[in-house]
């Protein structure tokens, strides 16, 4: 609570990534938002931030394939398709391990995860958060559905660009049952190579996603357009200016900005935050 309250003067805080279920974990000591004990713990953080005059959104997170069976009592991590993450190692509760080939999700499992997002959003509201940010970036589960690099499904959740967007859309629809849409944000990382990502049709995919998000009056769209996390080099990087041409709402830029470059982006009206 002290860590967050010390930063409340920034205006808006986006929490650390917070898992929506036990299945969602892939980092040691990650916080969660799926039971009453966690809700009570987060209340202390939220109250401390509010006491200092700040606002705070909770970032909803599922790691998908970027995990290991050591986190899940021996069960494989899950993903849209059984495609292994090409990485050096993952730090698990039992030490450094090689990544594993994940288990491809069934339709029933997908529906359960969508419900988990909805339940986690309800828990966030119970804890007093001002809103939630759906983490659809950085090679985690939602991003894995969006990109052909990690999604080879042949059903309604794979193949075409609209099908690959479907998972995010259904999560958004579920979260909206618990949280007012103007208190919901989405985070995307079109250019990132982190967690072994990058698809050849990324520009078409993410342009489509943003066009669809225009149908919702989101609190903001959070774009990791900067290249500080590494660029996948599958085409010309998508910039804030590209997103501004498409997205009609409040746009937030992130990743590798300095004070000067951030102010320049805002002054040129490429971003609002």
Please identify what each model-predicted range represents.
Residues 1-273:
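Flavin-dependent oxidoreductase catalytic cores
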